[in-house]
Amino acid sequence: MKIIKAKDYEDMSRKAANIISAQVILKPDCVMGLATCSTPIGAYKQLAAWYEKGDVDFAEVSTYNLDEYRGLSHDDPQSYHYFMRENFFDHINIDLNNTHVPDGSNPDAAAACSEYDKIVAAAGYPDLQLLGIGNNGHIGFNEPDDHFSKGTHCVDLTESTIQANSRLFDSIDDVPRQAYTMGTQTIMYARMILVVANGEAKAQAVHDMCYGPVTPECPASILQLHTNCVVVADEAALSLCK
């Protein structure tokens, strides 16, 4: 696991965007796994700015997002499909037919998850998987548990995750209680993993991810076993990594 220290959120975003753009430039038809938390927004904005300048071209890129709230349709303003269009896809030249997010509107969890696993596998899995990390060490919506998950599955969100995500909703009561998410096994199939983290609230999770025991109690700790994982984090998020 390689750790790149950034001064602050803006520096973290630019460093992460540099890695992502390098992947696109080196392999224009690359498969990208994308994250839908708030941490990567700065990187998405930087990539969109570079696209506007003609520095990077997303025309041949295909993307597969980690997760989606169960029960939300693609056009729901709180859905991650909507989030990706608002924060990234609508600002670059990507073919929307090549963008993929789990179908949160499908009430049949088993069918929705199985279908998403099939399309990710058919794409050959991501060349680069972008991840954020939750305060409790979750990646995607893989919450702390007594075992690591495999493929895409339906999860009950923990109270800490519901609380953390409530800032994006009018009320905590509006936050969905379940989500569809890629499993840790699927994430680990990516050829490169890029984790972004910022802020003091992430410090313990980042420390446990990088230096703690590999345990499903901190799902991100499994990334220690990946052969090509890069962590880009600001000084606050790395404050416990001495």
Where are these regions (language model features)?
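Class I SAM-dependent methyltransferase SAM-binding "motif I" and its flanking Rossmann-like core
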Residues: G140-T184
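Glycine-rich N-terminal segment of FAD-binding domains in flavoprotein oxidoreductases
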Residues: L26-E52
